[in-house]
A protein has these predicted regions:
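Bacterial N-terminal signal peptides that target proteins for export
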Residues: 1-11
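N-terminal signal peptide c-region/cleavage motif recognized by signal peptidases
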Residues: 17-19
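Exported/periplasmic ABC-transporter solute-binding proteins
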Residues: 25-144
């Protein structure tokens, strides 16, 4: 009885999570309009955001900015570029921090804050909803 109830609860949670991701539109990975960085592949973006690559492919320093933990946009982004669920991401960063190898990207309050920060600094990279694009930033990857 308890197992059946737990299974139903898990199924409901997974269904809600999938529905939330399906409702989300496209998101874009952005750099400053002043940046010399060209288009990036998903694996290059994942390497930057997972602290495996400290530089853009052109050699310039790369500093990632994240959306808040628990946001649908963040979950969609990491699933799209790295295949990591929120649970796997938490485990990954726990290991990286515990071993002293890296710290997770700095979190900002939302897409507007990420866009403003990225626009001001060519070393920054972030992700926002496609609809939030403006001329101050340039998309380098579209994530479905």
């Amino acid at each position: 009885m308890r197992l059946l109830r737990s299974s139903r609860l898990l199924a409901a949670v997974l269904l809600a999570a999938c529905a939330g991701l399906a409702q989300g539109g496209d998101l874009v990975v952005i750099v400053s309009a002043r940046s010399q960085v060209g288009a990036l592949r998903p694996e290059q973006v994942a390497a930057i955001f997972l602290a495996q690559a400290p530089r853009f492919p052109n050699g310039a320093v790369a500093n990632a900015l994240d959306q808040p933990v628990g946001s649908a946009l963040r979950d969609q982004f990491y699933l799209g570029v790295s295949g990591k669920t929120p649970a796997l991401l938490k485990v990954y960063w726990s290991k990286m921090v515990f071993t002293g190898r890296a710290q997770p990207p700095r979190e900002l309050a939302g897409s507007a804050a990420v866009r403003r920060a990225v626009a001001e600094d060519p070393a920054l990279i972030g992700y926002i909803e496609r609809e939030a694009l403006d001329p101050s930033v340039r998309p380098v990857l579209l994530v479905h």
